[in-house]
Each structure stands twice: as C-alpha cells, then as structure tokens.
Amino acid sequence: MNKERKGRFNDVISSLEEAKGEVEDILNEEQDSYDSLPDGLQMSSRGEKMQDYICLMEDCISKIDEVVGFVEEKIIKKK
C-alpha cells in the first residue's frame, strides 16, 4: 500500500475516536440518568433496560478501541 493510502487511515482513526467520544457522551448521560433514579425504579424493567443500554455502549466503546488498535498495528505500522 502506498504512503498516501496508508496515511488516510489516520483520518479513519480520527473518525473512530470522534465516534467513540460521542458514544462516551451518550453513555455518561444515560449513566447519570440511571444513577438519579430511586432504587425502586433502578430495579424496575425501565432501570434494567437502561442498564442493558449502558452495557451495550460500554461494549461499543471497547469494540471501537479494538478496531483502532487493529488499524494502528496491522495497517499503519506494517512495513
């Protein structure tokens, strides 16, 4: 792969990091919302759904990190 095409992956990483930041913002908002619920509502189906989404967003962030690491290690740094 030539340097120009390989260099474009830096833009891909920037886009992924930006998306990760957005997901983190949404995650933090949802976590704050969940934390402000009374204990009884946290244990309700609504609270459980919120927890499910929080877990999914944490997984999403982890997957983005995996992709960024893969691109950096296997594509950008490969000679």
What are these regions (language model features)?
Residues M1-K79:
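Long, low-complexity or tandemly repetitive, helically biased scaffold regions used
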